[in-house]
Amino acid sequence: MQFEKVTYIAVPQKYGQKKVGVEEGPKFLEKLGFMNVLEQVAKSVNKKTITEPKTPQELGVTNARNLNEVESVNIELRDTIAKEYDVNNLLINIGGDHSIGLGTIAGVVKAMKPNARVGVVWFDAHPDMNTPENSPSGNIHGMPLACAVGLGPQRLTSIMPHYITPKDIMYVGIRSIDVGEQFEIQDKHIDHFTAEDVKRVGMKEVIEAINKKFVDYDVIHLSFDIDGIDPEFILGTGTPVPKGISLEDSLYFMSEMGKMKKLHSVDIVEYNPKIEEEITGKNVLKCISSLFGIKC
């Protein structure tokens, strides 16, 4: 796989959750060889960095914690992606926590024509479909997809130029599902493969379902939370959940996603090197390499 250009957006965001270190994900992946991977597949690499928010004045528990900081990052990220998005090349966003998923979807939507169909593949242990009213934690990294479909604080939902719909989403790997999220998935009939489903039917069938679902869509956006992978392989992440996707299946998933002609943007999120650096970082790089068809 070869591109004229790959745009890499570093997003050092930690305020969608409470654990320090996830903002250093881009820096540590670069240290482990991420830029070398990009240089193997692109004639040029265009790096952008989103402004890291200053420490909030108050870190008290609310039902939408650090709203100002999450809002500012997602607005800047949306506008950067809208400017850099290119259907002839690839854009990769490295977080940072998964609250950035709102800005990345918003950026793709903003870059496309108003009637374009944007499909979202959400690889994650969590659906991220909470709202401040039903979130057990108040952490906004559990809310980005809710905001993208129009549920949540107006300051966040308004970041979307227009909302995607629940039918535009395909979940892969979910297994830690809050009550409000379960209601939305069932009520809105959101397509999904739990981690248990993946083990039962095989990742090949998941890929076939993704291709079939998005056959009439204009573009696909992949948001890849590393906690979708089983903690046996991913130690350095803030909210690990047992019984996840195997590393082998994750590498196959990424290699097949990378072959999709409609995929032009990817998020890699929730790598926290302060929790564990080397094993997790190397496995994340393997996933990124597989996306580009590079054998690990």
From Swiss-Prot:
Source taxon at top rank: Eukaryota
Binding site for Mn(2+) 2: H98, D124, D128, D225
GO CC annotations on file: cytoplasm; cytosol
Pathway annotation: Nitrogen metabolism; urea cycle; L-ornithine and urea from L-arginine: step 1/1
InterPro entries found in the cross-reference section: Arginase, Ureohydrolase, Ureohydrolase_dom_sf
Enzymatic reactions: L-arginine + H2O = urea + L-ornithine
Cofactor note: Binds 2 manganese ions per subunit.
Temperature dependence, free-text field: Optimum temperature is 55 degrees Celsius. Active up to 70 degrees Celsius.
Entry's Gene Ontology molecular function annotations: arginase activity; identical protein binding; manganese ion binding
A Gene Ontology biological process term: urea cycle
SUPFAM superfamilies referenced in this protein's UniProt entry, alphabetically: Arginase/deacetylase
EC numbers, comma separated: 3.5.3.1
Annotated binding of L-arginine, by residue: N130, S137, D178, D227, T239
Regulation: Substitution of the loosely bound surface exposed Mn(2+) with Mg(2+), Zn(2+), Ni(2+) or Co(2+) results in similar catalytic activity, substitution with Cd(2+) and Cu(2+) reduces catalytic activity and substitution with Hg(2+) and Ca(2+) inhibits the enzyme. Inhibited by L-norvaline.
Alphabetic keyword roster: Arginine metabolism, Hydrolase, Manganese, Metal-binding
Activity's dependence on pH: Optimum pH is 8.5-9.
Cofactor(s) in the UniProt record: Mn(2+)
Residues engaged in binding Mn(2+) 1: D124, H126, D225, D227
Record text on subunit structure and interactions: Monomer. Homodimer; dimerization is dispensable for catalytic activity.
Protein task: Catalyzes the hydrolysis of L-arginine into urea and L-ornithine, which is a precursor for polyamine biosynthesis. By depleting host L-arginine, a substrate for nitric oxide synthase (NOS), prevents the production of nitric oxide (NO) by host activated macrophages, and thus allows the parasite to evade host immune response.
Similarity annotation: Belongs to the arginase family.
Name used for this protein in its record: Arginase
Organism from which the protein derives: Entamoeba histolytica (strain ATCC 30459 / HM-1:IMSS / ABRM)
Lineage, broadest ranks: Eukaryota, Amoebozoa, Evosea, Archamoebae, Mastigamoebida
